[in-house]
Amino acid sequence: MVNHKGEVQSLGKKSEKCYSYYMNNIESAKEFATRKFAEVNVENHFLEVYGFLKEDFKVNDENILVAGLLHDVLEDTNTTDEEMSEKFGQDVLNLVLEVSHVKNWKDPTRPEMTKQDLMSEYYEHIREIPGRAKLIKIADFTSHMGNFIKIYQKNEQHLYPKFVNNDKYITQIQNFLNSCEDSLAKEKLWKLTVELEQKNRLSAFNMLD
């Protein structure tokens, strides 16, 4: 006869093993991203994006969380698709690819495409990506919007002219959100875009005084 208590203990050990594997993947992704960005001397907000996904949006899909940590790695470092796939699996790679644009906004296979062309193409692309990838992009944009608002709060907009009064960027994000299913994540980001719009208008008005 199987001892019920023994079954519970066995299930408990399996659960602990799964949790340990889950955390090892998360920690491995944090270490990987930290090392890759250090190699190219670039600061990145990947921990903040991870925080929005896990704490604010209550995401428990491990691959989404790992991809959130790695979402800029292909764009901004020398990491290859093969390297990421081998270390974190094809699903994580696919999620990161969905939210990534070409490096430095230059496509060597289409030299005639300008940066503006590629950016327009990218914002059209993210409207069509799967919902799991959209969650990562919402977290990414949420981080950016929050940081832009902090610039205004610190009255430092003169130090970051390209990050403020950028109504086109806000419109692109809102167009993206219109393609997303309703969620608390979508609502949070939408409110931030509206707040930044208001700060942009106030800043422009003050410049006229």
Task: Please give the residue ranges for each predicted region.
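Acidic, Ala/Val/Gly-enriched low-complexity intrinsically disordered segments
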Residues: 2, 7-8, 16
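Active-site helical microenvironments for divalent-metal-assisted chemistry
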Residues: 12-209
